[in-house]
Amino acid sequence: RNAETKMAWLMPVLFLPPIGALLYLNLRRRPRPRRRLKQLAEKFAGMECLYVKKDGHVGTEYAGDGFAASCAEYVAQATGLPPTDCYEFEYFPSGESYCERLLEELEKAEKYIFLEYFILRPGKFWNSVLDILKRKAGEGVDVRVIYDDIGSMLKVPDNYAAELEKQGVKCMCFNPFRPVLDLAQNNRTHRKIALIDGVTAFTGGINLSDEYINETHPFGHWKDTGIMVRGRAAQNFAAMFLQLWFLRAPDEDYTRYLSTGPKGDCSCLAFCDSPLDRQNVCEDLYLKIIY
């Protein structure tokens, strides 16, 4: 066990001996993931062949840069998401610019819209997005939303997923909270992903809530960033989203959402951590870069 874990247990054991010892004995083992999480993890393993190159050398896009190639190899092996490319990239220095561009791209959707966010909160930002989603769903666009139950708790009604379903938006509340002693409740999705037609993808640190675009100021002026990529890299974001959506529809054929598009001239390593496994891919990669 790593040093951080040991130190975290040392404090309650030393200062609250009876209680700390009992907690340690009961919780020291990593909890088995709930059945639904385990099923999705297994599905993810089975889906790897859809988007990982089979030659075993996924870092060839970074010929001449051994370090970048080794990073790409590690990410592909750990996540099943290969290095890819895009033909357009845009950086958003604020939530306001991110919001404006996201709304523009959502209006262009013709096939499908996938959204996965930690926080949904009714207000100017989310209401503007939702208006588009409902209209697009009425036009026949496949609209799907995943939000985290803990992240959105006390921000949306308990039955919010059902409410969105009635409005034509397919919705899944990830890992609903249950008031029991269950460490699987810590398995949350903090990802912020928007995917349009399998070509355009957004990500970053911005949730669908007004404080992120400074319409409200519960924590002062909010500064966060986001990006948009257009091209084959969007398929990696489709894979990320669908790994979680499998919880809702395990028998659906997802391969139609993972088709490749035109090759771009900009290399892109699009990957994520997952609430479904015990790998800390992002942390490991940062440490690899630092050291």
Please tell me what each predicted stretch does.
Residues 1-291:
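N-terminal localization/anchoring segments of enzymes in phospholipid and broader phosphate metabolism
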